[in-house]
Curated annotation (Swiss-Prot):
Main location: membrane
Taxonomic source organism: Haemonchus contortus (Barber pole worm)
Descriptive protein name: Glutamate-gated chloride channel subunit beta
Glycan attachment residues as annotated in the record: 52, 219
MF terms (GO), sorted A to Z: chloride channel activity; extracellular ligand-gated monoatomic ion channel activity; transmembrane signaling receptor activity
Cystine connections: 164-178, 226-237
Length: 432
């Protein structure tokens, strides 16, 4: 009898052990069994049932969330910018729900990036894209997450170069508004409707937008006012708009400061003696060539546009002031040469008259006053006398032109600055 009891106990232990092994095996392969059961009758060619069960023919709602990881290479010439982002889409596919399958303690979600090719994915594309790629190092930077109720989260890391239609009328005081759109390529609004995540539609990695060399990201707005209507139907669209403010401090140092100094240097010509032709011409030509070179260098960084920019007004005015200084000397030199020609003719006429008078006069003793040369000493003018001579209005017309130019031209440049900067501030305030 004892032998029978021992055999019975051994049998019970063996059955219990095999049952425990079976439960452990079932727990270890639970996710695999869930996936096999979900995909057994799944057809990726058919879109999921509508999100709104009350409308059996309604569209699938795809909720979108974007995280901007990097913003760089804002190219004004090609009107484009580059950014790296994490693009997330979320939708409900009731065919993938596994809460009702009866598994004990099912997982909170299934992370299954390897079955992407077996699932229905929204055919989202970016209309403003010029170039883009997904990151594959060390593996494909994406994941798929399936929740018990059938909610699917698809996330992917993308680098994209997108076009941005820039308005450069206020360059370099401009604000740029760059639109980033996403649309379904094949499904109309009867099949897919996009909506932004109401909690956080766009997220920024810390530091993004504040480390750009010439711009600063000041604002991000989202909307859905970009629905595309074509002859094949209406396609839902979402839009993210980036507001980029150009950093003016760079252009103050590299553009406005140097050009202002060139204009001021050209005014030195008004203080140089009108008979110093070589010095005044060399100064005028040098400043004019420098101004032209700077203008060409600045325009090389901009696209050829058909409208006038505020920087064109500034450069044109500076070049006008520099060229005007050179023309002023040309006019002064011409007036001086005309005056000297008239004086030479007058002296020649007086000399001829004196010669004729000498021939008619009878020689007579002429009185010579005693020499008083030793009574006078050489006089060295003081600094005050020299300063007074510079600021005393002359009677000679060419010198009078130089005199007025010394004061009128700087005042004219100051008046231009007042009008220019006031107009710029008014136009910029209308954009903000």
């Amino acid at each position: 009898m004892s032998q029978y009891m021992m055999v019975a106990v051994a049998a019970v232990v063996a059955v219990a052990g095999s049952s425990q092994i079976s439960r452990r095996s079932t727990g270890g392969t639970q996710e695999q069994e869930i996936l096999n059961e979900l995909l057994s009758n799944y057809d990726m060619r058919v879109r999921p049932p509508p999100s709104n069960y009350s409308d059996p023919m309604g569209p699938v709602t795809v909720r979108v969330n974007i995280m901007i990881r990097m913003l760089s290479k804002i190219d004004v010439v090609n009107m484009e910018y580059s950014m790296q982002l994490t693009f997330r889409e979320q939708w409900l596919d009731s065919r993938l729900a596994y809460a009702h399958l009866g598994y004990h303690n099912p997982p909170k979600f299934l992370t299954v990036p390897h079955i992407k090719s077996n699932l229905w994915i929204p055919d989202t594309f970016f209309p403003t894209e010029k170039a883009a790629h997904r990151h594959l190092i060390d593996t494909d930077n994406m994941f798929l997450r399936i929740h018990p109720d059938g909610k699917v989260l698809y996330s992917s890391r993308i680098s994209i170069t997108s076009s941005c239609h820039m308005q450069l009328q206020l360059y370099p005081l401009d604000l740029q508004f760059c639109d980033f759109d996403l649309v379904s390529y094949a499904h109309t609004m009867k099949d897919i409707v996009y909506e932004w995540d109401p909690l956080a539609p766009v997220q920024l990695k810390p530091g993004v937008g504040s480390d750009l060399p010439n711009f600063q990201l000041t604002n991000i707005t989202t909307n859905d006012d970009c629905t595309s209507h074509t002859n094949t139907g209406s396609y839902a669209c979402l839009r993210m708009q980036l507001t980029l403010k150009r950093q003016f401090s760079y252009y103050l140092v590299q553009l406005y400061g140097p050009t202002t100094m060139i204009v001021i240097v050209s005014w030195v010509s008004f203080w140089i003696d009108m008979h110093s032709t070589a010095g005044r011409v060399a100064l005028g030509v040098t400043t004019l060539l420098t101004m032209t070179t700077m203008q060409a260098a600045i325009n090389a960084k901009l696209p050829p546009v058909s409208y006038v920019k505020v920087v064109d007004v500034w450069l044109g005015a500076c070049q006008t002031f520099v060229f005007g200084a050179l023309l002023e000397y040309a006019f002064v030199s011409y007036q001086d040469s005309q005056r000297q020609t008239e004086q030479a003719k007058s002296r020649a006429a007086r000399k001829a008259q004196k010669r004729r008078a000498k021939m008619e006069l009878v020689e007579r003793e002429q009185y010579q006053p005693p020499c008083t040369c030793h009574l006078y000493q050489d006089y060295e003018p003081s600094f005050r006398d020299r300063l007074r001579r510079y600021f005393t209005k002359p009677d000679y017309l060419p010198a009078k032109i130089d005199y007025y130019a010394r004061f009128c031209v700087p005042l004219g440049f100051l008046a231009f600055n007042a009008i220019y900067w006031t107009s710029c501030l008014v136009m910029v305030s209308r954009l903000v």
